Every structure is written in C-alpha cells, then in structure tokens.
C-alpha cells in the first residue's frame, strides 16, 4: 500500500523513511506475531468468461440456453459481450478450495445443458468469420435488457465485435475485517475507520496500475492465435 496511508511524518531528528523501507516494515508487521492472522480469510470471487463453440470450433449462433436461466437476472450464469460468451460468477468465498469447487460445479451444470457445444478453453476466439459471426448478447425487451444490448451494439461500432469476444478471468478480492485495525495501527492512522479503508484501497489501486503491466507481460501473452482471428480483426 502507498499513498497517504503510507506516509510517515518526518521528525527533526529522523529523516522521512523511504517507501521501500516503510513497505518492508509494514510487511513485517503484518506477517509476524499477533498480526499474522490478519491476512487470512479475505473474500475471493471469480468471474470466468468462455465462448460457446460448435464441434468444429466456430462460435455458436444459438441463443443462451434457457435451462441456464435468464442472462439478465441470473447472478451466477450470465453472458458478457456476445450471446455465445458465457460468464460464470462465483459468490464471495473465504476459502480458495470453496471457490474452485463452486466454479467446478458451475461448469458441470452448464455442460449438462450445452448439447454438442463446448466451452472454448482459451482467451482468443477461433474460426472467426468476421464481425457477423459473433452474435451480440440479447437480454429481452425490458428497458434494462434493451439498454444492455444497445450498449454492446455501440461497442461493436467503436471497437469491433472480434475484440470484444476475447474472453478472460476476473479475480475479485477484499481484505478480511481483522486486517484493517492492524494496518491502521501499523500506519499510526488518525483517520476514521471508513476513511482509512477507502484511502488504503485507492493506494492499492495506484500501486496496481503502476506495476500491473508486468503481470500482463509475463502471463497475458497468447503465444498462438487462430489466423482467422487476426484477419477478422483487420477486415471486420
């Protein structure tokens, strides 16, 4: 964490500590002694996107399976950009094994209602035949449903459907309640609990934006993509 919560007031006899030294001091305080439990039990959640494809690898043109519930109102099985782009959403859970098991159960349930279709396992789509081969998600005739569809039509005009069909995994995390008093004590904060927590989360986001590129560089590369994907993006 950095930002205002990471600052150490200088004194006439002691210079301001560097960010690295303060980071090491804070990390040591969180991982040793009575504070070691403070990082355990945070809430975790996963949102996983996967394209429905036919046995030949082409993106499915069929509607979102009715047996999976309404994509507009189902909180755990919905669609993202495309009607074929299923999104599986876990609730926030404390244990990693619970998270993986819930996601596994969702996959098994979905596969029971896909017929001969498959969930494409990689982020980059395959066997793409231009923008027209990617159906935009539909959410019914209600005002909210129509708004969600029109929003996606706008994305198609701005970025193209092929780019929007790239799927991914979102990982959500929140620190456990016991973490915040410990961190506030280490930071010698005089702010209210609410203000301190908000400040700390924004500081974390700033650090993520500063260092997040290395995660994409190391783990976000796709070493191989289908030739149809690149040609569709240049002509779609």
Task: Please report, for each region that a protein language model flagged, where it lies by residue.
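Histidine-centered active-site/metal-ligand motif
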Residues: 170
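Terminal catalytic/cofactor-binding subdomain
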Residues: 5-156, 163-167, 196-220
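Extended, regular secondary-structure scaffolds
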Residues: 173-236
